[in-house]
Amino acid sequence: MSASANTNPLLDFSGLPRFGEIRPEHVTPALDTLLDAASRAVETASAQETPSTWAAVVETVEQATEPLGRAWGIVGHLNAVADTPELRAAYGENLPRVTEFWSSVGQNLALYEKYKAIAASAEYATLSAERKKILDNALRDFRLSGAELPEEQKPRFAELQEQQAALSKAFSDHVLDATNAYAYVVEDEAELAGLPGDAIEAAREAAQKDGKAGWKFTLHFPSYFPVLQYAENRALRETLYRAYATRASELGPQYGGGKAEWDNTAIVADELKLRREEAQMLGYRNFAEVSLAPKMAESPQQVIAFLEDLATRARPHADKDWDELRTFAAKELGLAELAPWDVAYAAEKLRQQRYAFSENEVKQYFPEPAALKGLFTVTETLFGVRIKPDEAPVWHKDVRFFRVENRDGSLVAQFYLDLYAREGKRGGAWMDDARSRAKRGSDVQTPVAYLTCNFSAPIGGKPACFTHDEVITLFHEFGHGLHHMLTRVDELGVSGINGVEWDAVELPSQFMENFCWEWDVLSSMSSHVDTGAALPRELFDKMIAAKNFQSGLGTLRQIVFSMFDMLLHVDFDPAGATGVTAFAREINERYHVIPQAAFSRWPNTFSHIFAGGYAAGYYSYKWAEVLSADAYAAFEEAAAQSGSVLDAATGTRYRREILEVGGSRPAMDSFKAFRGREPEIDALLRHNGMAAPAH
């Protein structure tokens, strides 16, 4: 492979990806080489004459598929952060080939028999716990990949996987295209009353970039949401809300000027039909059972009961929140009826009146250099590492690169940081692995992470400033990054986040969010963008008082998403009379107190479950929040003794029992090793201001 690595940067695995040199035309030739090598390795490993041993089977497959995963990971990453028509075409062309390869591995009966033989052999007893876990996971995944299906059913099962991958990609493309296509230009500055200065400035720059006068607003979140939250012009809020809520739907052309072919309605129905068929082929009653097989939660019923319990506890708080908001809007804002495009605006006004501060005021205290320094200080203090700037080729001039070292200077990991929203970059925030930790003979391959956000870029020569929510997002994604980077596991299949149950994956990310509510952390990491002053204690106290503002409504919103997702995959019939849009409305009516707009088509942009791997898994956020809140409570308990939540002894224990072990043991075992007991919901309720009243 090294010979062609000179000419094709995607085939060079000697170091970090050569981002400056990778071109769309490299994708297909690289995958030709890698898929060929991986297929041959699978053939060798599954051959009758190959001994059923770890080295001859598992290692052979792993060593050939890891480069494939890394190269395809780079292509997928670039497709998400630097989308061009050429790259999108190269990705789309090769996605079916990669899907087909993994499908064929998952269904390879001869390979499955080899894995079963290793698990039944004398060698199994001598394997490390990590290797046993990899084997056990593999056997489970083989079953879920259709390895036990009769031969004549396998082509159809493979077809299902390929069709689902293609539909996911189309869903995602449609959301991106519909979001990118919309622009609303305001020509009269008076219409912008209420908007923060930086939002107005960003809109002016966006219009200038197009060679236009006025202020350009888009459906990208940093442009769209300030309008919803601050604009006094109700018609402007409504215009943008309608465009946002109907993206990628049959109403898109009417409200957002999108194209009819970006409508995701049929894609959603098709995905649900295919998932249902897949579940039936595997002998499950529904797709939710398939989704939960590798997760912590034991059954759809357990998840539904968990969500129902949380909904019941949150409902009285949500009722109170909604009543307060409606009363305030009628009395103070002259809004007799709260329309959906009024909710964020009224909530922001009530929050400002009640707590006398705005998100925008807080934002000035978190310029990017201070926020990053704060994040790194927390990490260094708790986990005994050092974070330093480093050098590597990047895909955009705004991307930075860092290294994580132990105190003795030895390299632990590296990461890319891509913080700003821009054209051709998928919305949202995420962590992805560029390379996983693994031992190769006596050499350790250190992990590398991609950390991606979509914050507003710097304007007017000043550093970017982050809202408190954005600071929380930064800590959240870095928590995922730490899970990936601080692992001590040497086996690729269970190092870092590999092999971690999906509903436990959010534990380390949501755990980190808690530090964003601590006075000593925030005061030390704040520095006003103009004066350098630290966040005033008085402002912090207001933020804390406002922390659980409308947390009842926020909790019910998440329950609507989670319950919609779970019930959609338990007993919803995609071929039945009730469409997905109507079903979403039913769920909203059942669990939420805020009515849904008749034109809202939010399922059509629910990328988590239709393009992001969260199908029958969205509940994981709340499930993991129970774990993360309870884990954080250990630091609160330590602070009662030591005076600070930045308690190094507890941090060391957390690093050892949660972060370092990665996926090498069940998440429940890791949690119990850290906490000394099973998780309890009390800390979550307390952190959300919904602790049950004392009896």
Predicted feature descriptions by range:
Residues 2-29, 33, 193-194, 209, ...:
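C-terminal, non-catalytic "cap/extension" segments appended to globular domains
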Residues 3-33, 80, 89-298, 317, ...:
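His/Asp/Glu-rich acidic catalytic environments and adjacent acidic regulatory segments
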Residues 19-31, 53-58, 260-264, 303-307, ...:
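Membrane-entry segments of alpha-helical transmembrane domains in multi-pass membrane proteins
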Residues 35-126, 556-592, 596, 615:
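C-terminal non-catalytic alpha-helical accessory regions
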Residues 53-55, 86, 91-92, 263, ...:
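Membrane-interfacial loop-to-helix junctions in multi-pass inner-membrane proteins
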Residues 66-77, 140, 242, 343-349, ...:
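Short, hydrophobic/amphipathic alpha-helical patches that form generic packing surfaces
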Residues 130, 134, 166-169, 173, ...:
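Active-site-proximal, well-structured secondary-structure segments within enzyme catalytic domains
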Residues 456-475:
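Short pre-active-site segment immediately N-terminal to the catalytic Zn-binding motif
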